[in-house]
């Protein structure tokens, strides 16, 4: 798995990196059967919004198109959990379209 992590407005700590890798494990199980090389680009950002100060975005390429999932919220770790669930759901949907 190739993983590119970019942050804006915050330090990328080892705990955040581990949380991102853990969050992508669910999606990795789905993509292993679809592609020989998984490539995920993850962007995390601390915004100026008091309601939703954290933004996370995951981009991956599957079935000749880019799949982009974006979430925001008050807690970065909760946002990472939400975005990983959303990404897994979208990947399953794409897999069913092409293999069922």
Regions found by a protein language model. Give the residues of each.
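N-terminal, polar/charged subdomain of small-to-medium soluble alpha/beta proteins
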Residues: 1-100
């Amino acid at each position: 798995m190739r993983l590119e992590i970019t942050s804006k407005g915050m330090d990328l700590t080892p705990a955040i990196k581990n949380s991102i890798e853990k969050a992508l494990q669910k999606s990795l199980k789905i993509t292993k059967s679809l592609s020989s090389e998984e490539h995920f680009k993850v962007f995390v950002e601390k915004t100026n919004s008091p309601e939703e100060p954290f933004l996370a975005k995951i981009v991956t390429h599957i079935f000749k198109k880019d799949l982009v999932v974006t979430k925001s919220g008050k807690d970065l770790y909760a946002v990472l959990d939400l975005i990983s669930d959303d990404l897994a759901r979208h990947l399953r949907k794409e897999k069913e379209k092409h293999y069922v």
